A protein has these predicted regions:
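ATP/NTP phosphate-donor binding region
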Residues: 1-92
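A glycine/threonine-rich phosphate-anchoring loop and its flanking beta-alpha core
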Residues: 9, 113-207
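Catalytic cores of large soluble enzymes that bind and process phosphate-bearing ligands
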Residues: 13-14, 70, 183, 187, ...
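Short glycine-/acidic-enriched loop or helix-start segments at secondary-structure transitions
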Residues: 47-50, 104-106, 146-147
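Acidic-aromatic/histidine active-site loop/patch
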Residues: 99
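DPxDG-like acidic metal-binding loop motif
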Residues: 103-115
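Active-site segments that bind and position negatively charged phosphate/pyrophosphate groups
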Residues: 201-249
């Protein structure tokens, strides 16, 4: 059976586009007695990015630690902290960081509208209720988490994603400027993550023309970045991450 693919519905790409986040939130998430939840990798807690967050006085900012892979217990903790913050659910959840930070944001947005523990939903299409409107903003390229329909979590018994159409971000902002400060070593490893995703996809059992087209383009971009020293490498690596994520989706 051919599946009906759910994709990110709105994509903003370009250097400096992060500064348009406030406009998007004003349109989608702002209202009387409403707040927005920001889940941001704690590596940015003392960085200039902190001052660029379009926070309002009623919003909740939580710095997330991703030194270890995201755990279901941590997702449940962040979900409860958000519920305790206000009598209402947030109008939006914003995930800013690498793949783990974005996975946490996706998982929390789901658990705010679904009962129980996030461990209950590890598997395929177990989520019953749509997530809170959520936005993903990658600050490093390679994982493809910004476009995937899964959020990979370590549970009490297994490491497995919450795989659901409701997991997919409603909006992503792909701003290559956010990756400029990434250390060369880390940039290489996440870039190779993208490259390996594409190799896996192109040799997969269920390969079709759709996945092949994205995988081949992502591989081409990865090679341009790593072999040619392209001056637009940040832009190309961000797009390789997007295409690679689409290929394995």
């Amino acid at each position: 059976m051919i599946k009906n693919l759910k994709n990110v519905s709105h994509i903003l790409f370009g250097r400096g586009c992060f500064d348009q986040l406030g406009e998007i939130l004003a349109e989608k998430c702002r209202g009387r007695d409403s707040f927005v939840l920001f889940l941001v990798d704690d590596v940015f807690s003392q960085s200039p990015l902190r001052e660029r967050l379009p926070l309002k006085t009623q919003d909740l900012l939580l710095w997330v630690n991703v030194d270890d892979e995201p755990k279901t217990a941590y997702v449940d903790e962040l979900t409860q902290r958000t519920k305790d913050f206000s009598g209402n659910l947030p109008r939006g959840v914003i995930g800013i960081g690498g793949g783990s930070a974005m996975d946490i944001a996706k998982a929390v947005s789901l658990m705010l509208t679904n009962p129980g523990s996030s461990a209950d939903y590890q598997g395929w299409d177990l989520v019953e209720n749509p997530a809170v409107y959520h936005i993903g903003i990658p600050t490093i390229a390679g994982t493809g988490a910004e476009v995937s329909r899964t959020t990979v979590l370590n549970g009490p018994q297994k490491k497995l994603g919450i795989n659901s159409n409701y997991t997919v971000f409603d909006q992503i902002l792909i701003d290559p400027e956010l990756t400029i400060s990434v250390a060369a070593e880390q940039r290489f490893y996440t870039g190779m993550d993208c490259y390996i995703h594409c190799v896996e996809s192109l040799h997969g059992t269920y390969l079709n023309a759709f996945a092949k087209s994205y995988g081949e383009k992502a591989l081409c971009l990865c090679r341009e970045v790593f072999l040619d020293g392209d001056p637009d490498s940040n832009d190309k690596m961000m797009m390789a991450s997007y295409f690679g994520g689409m290929s394995i989706t």
